């Protein structure tokens, strides 16, 4: 069985490199880091899209860029797979994203897993769609 572990790496959590080394040492198959680069100042979508959810936790605003964090982890580990869980592709420039994906994959010797998605925050999705159309 392959088991993975995910955290929201921020300046207030365990260092991503320390996390990756520990997970690798414990035999986990992969680590997954999310992406939350755009937090609207005015949000009506409840956290996680769930009606009645509490306010958005502060760590969302402090989340490290997954490609930078995973690149650091790639340099510090040898076997654990490194993944985005998830990369919000609709919010990103496709050329920069392709370069970042290729870079982390090359620096990790093919250990990168590219998890993608759209996310749950409707305000972000609306803005991204307007900008790209």
Region roles according to the model:
Residues 1-76:
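N-terminal beta1-alpha1-beta2 module of alpha/beta enzyme domains
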Residues 2, 82-85:
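Short beta-strands and strand-loop turn motifs
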Residues 2-14, 89-132:
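Flexible, glycine-rich active-site loops centered on histidine and acidic residues
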Residues 24-25, 70-79, 101, 105-112:
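Acidic (Asp/Glu)-rich catalytic clusters
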Residues 31, 82, 112-114:
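Hydrophobic residues within beta-strands of alpha/beta enzymes
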Residues 38, 68, 87-90, 121:
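Generic, ordered loop/turn and secondary-structure boundary motif
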Residues 57-61, 87-92:
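Glycine-rich "substrate-gating" loop/helix at the edge of Rossmann-like oxidoreductase active sites
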């Amino acid at each position: 069985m392959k088991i993975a572990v995910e955290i929201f790496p921020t300046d207030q959590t365990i260092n991503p490199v320390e996390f990756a080394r520990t997970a690798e040492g414990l035999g986990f198959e992969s680590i997954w880091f999310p992406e939350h680069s755009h937090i609207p100042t005015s949000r009506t979508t409840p956290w996680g899209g769930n009606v009645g959810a509490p306010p958005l936790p502060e760590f969302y605003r402090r989340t490290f860029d997954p490609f930078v964090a995973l690149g650091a982890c790639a340099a510090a580990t040898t076997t654990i797979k490194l993944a985005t869980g998830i990369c919000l592709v609709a919010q990103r420039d496709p050329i920069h994203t392709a370069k970042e994906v290729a870079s982390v994959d090359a620096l990790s010797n093919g250990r990168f897993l590219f998890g993608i998605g759209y996310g749950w925050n409707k305000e972000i999705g609306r803005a991204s769609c307007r900008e790209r159309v």
